[in-house]
């Protein structure tokens, strides 16, 4: 059996990074182009587009693509796509730049000032941000939901069109062993003889329930390999830095998994906290990375109490035949059971809640930050030792993230103007 095809009608990876002389020539040309400044999420989307993880997208969405994605989960050609990938600009910046439809522009990361891509603007359009929030995030609560807050903080206009990606960022230097493009993970899987790979999405150090989910998948008989795939894009307050988390993953993989059945990789996307919709996005690009299954457990990609614990599982049931080649591996509540003397789930354990230790990522981080002594059922000692060392020197931050924490003063002003 072969690996699943990349997503989209052409069934081939479509990386957008230029290389060699073409790249150098485009960088030189970009110096004379009008500049459009990007948020950290837009910059991370450039990296995902560049490596081919967002295949079959050729750039930032035009209005028809945005509308189909938001309201129907489809691009105009019928390809399933669950979340917007858009570039916005304020009315003031648009007027000052003189940019028009047909213009070529240089895309600059607002924080670093670095050039990341060039873009041909095929369309300048406005969107209904309230409709996007309600359709994609199922809420318009900009004060509590970080994805909604960022939606309302976007500029008044979107720019749609193809890009030429020029800057691969610095993740290669930070994670030289694990920062892999879809073509590279596919080659890795093939070298191991894997064709039925399951992906595990994580932005936290892995506690015992996480470990159990991956092992449960490996023991299911449906898969021949697993990839722990960690997000290392921009973090929010209370999150543990990627470098520390990677040390935790290494300790877990080295001590508790057979290396012939496990792979570890990282990717640069910024979390959207889209719950069910984001679970579908995770599935799309995991298919591009070569995976046939995605573990979808409790509250996948959620935040707060905006989604039911298993909404991210049931949304896959709403898809039409052929929407994805990847399938969800749906797993119920997992916990440590003292009577079973092992990790278990509602499918395997008959005992009551008084016998169970249910571990959540928030509980795990808060206990570590406060220096609380954790029972062995929470995490492996090698992982806990790394985290204890990190928290001894880390600045104390509030674990619960406010939706506005990543936003600039200009973005906050837009929200306070009335969610325009």
Swiss-Prot record:
Signal sequence interval, chain numbering: none
One of the GO BP terms on file: sulfate assimilation
Pathway as given in its UniProt record: Sulfur metabolism; hydrogen sulfide biosynthesis; sulfite from sulfate: step 1/3
Top-level division of the source organism's lineage: Bacteria
Main enzyme class: transferase
Any one GO molecular function term: sulfate adenylyltransferase (ATP) activity
Keywords assigned: ATP-binding, Nucleotide-binding, Nucleotidyltransferase, Transferase
Pfam family for this entry, one: ATP-sulfurylase
Enzyme nomenclature, EC number: 2.7.7.4
Keyword Nucleotide-binding applies: yes
Reaction equation(s) it catalyzes: sulfate + ATP + H(+) = adenosine 5'-phosphosulfate + diphosphate
Listed InterPro entries: ATP-Sase_PUA-like_dom (IPR025980), PUA-like_sf (IPR015947), Rossmann-like_a/b/a_fold (IPR014729), SO4_adenylyltransferase_pro (IPR020792), Sulfurylase_cat_dom (IPR024951), Sulphate_adenylyltransferase (IPR002650)
Family: Belongs to the sulfate adenylyltransferase family.
Alphabetical list of NCBIfam families matching this protein: PRK04149.1, sopT
Name used for this protein in its record: Sulfate adenylyltransferase
């Amino acid at each position: 059996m072969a690996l699943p095809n990349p997503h989209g009608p052409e069934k081939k990876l479509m990386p957008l990074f230029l290389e060699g002389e073409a790249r150098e020539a485009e960088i030189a040309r970009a110096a004379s182009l009008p500049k459009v400044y990007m948020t950290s999420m837009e910059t991370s989307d450039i990296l995902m587009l560049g490596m081919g993880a967002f295949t079959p997208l050729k750039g930032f969405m035009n209005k028809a693509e945005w509308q189909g994605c938001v309201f129907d989960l489809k691009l105009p050609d019928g390809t399933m796509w669950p979340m917007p990938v858009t570039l916005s600009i304020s009315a003031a910046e648009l007027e000052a730049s003189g940019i028009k439809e047909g213009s070529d522009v240089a895309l600059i990361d607002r924080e670093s000032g670095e050039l990341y891509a060039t873009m041909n603007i095929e369309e300048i359009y406005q969107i209904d941000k309230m409709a996007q929030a309600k359709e994609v995030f199922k809420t318009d609560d900009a004060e509590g939901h970080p994805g909604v807050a960022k939606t309302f903080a976007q500029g008044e206009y979107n720019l749609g069109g193809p890009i030429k990606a020029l800057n691969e960022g610095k993740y290669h230097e930070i994670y030289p062993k694990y920062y892999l493009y879809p073509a590279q993970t596919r080659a890795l899987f093939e070298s191991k003889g894997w064709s039925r790979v399951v992906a595990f999405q994580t932005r936290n150090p892995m506690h015992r329930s996480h470990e159990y989910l991956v092992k449960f998948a490996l023991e299911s008989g449906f898969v021949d390999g697993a990839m722990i795939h960690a997000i290392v894009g921009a973090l929010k307050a209370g999150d543990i830095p990627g470098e520390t988390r990677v040390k935790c993953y290494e300790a877990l993989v080295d001590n508790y998994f057979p290396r012939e059945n496990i792979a570890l990789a990282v990717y640069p996307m910024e979390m959207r906290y889209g719950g069910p919709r984001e679970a579908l996005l995770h599935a799309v690009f995991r298919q591009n990375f070569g995976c046939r299954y995605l573990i979808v457990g409790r509250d996948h990609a959620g935040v707060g109490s905006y989604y039911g614990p298993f909404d991210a599982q049931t949304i896959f049931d709403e898809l039409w035949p052929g929407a994805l080649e990847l399938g969800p591996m749906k797993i119920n509540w997992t916990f440590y059971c003292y009577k079973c003397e092992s990790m278990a789930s509602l499918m395997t354990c008959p005992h009551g809640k008084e016998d169970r230790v249910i571990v959540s990522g928030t509980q795990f981080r808060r206990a570590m930050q406060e220096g609380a002594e954790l029972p062995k059922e929470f995490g492996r000692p090698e992982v806990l030792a790394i985290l204890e060392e990190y928290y001894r020197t880390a600045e104390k931050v509030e674990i619960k993230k406010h939706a506005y924490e990543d936003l600039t003063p200009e973005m906050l002003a837009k929200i306070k103007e009335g969610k325009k």
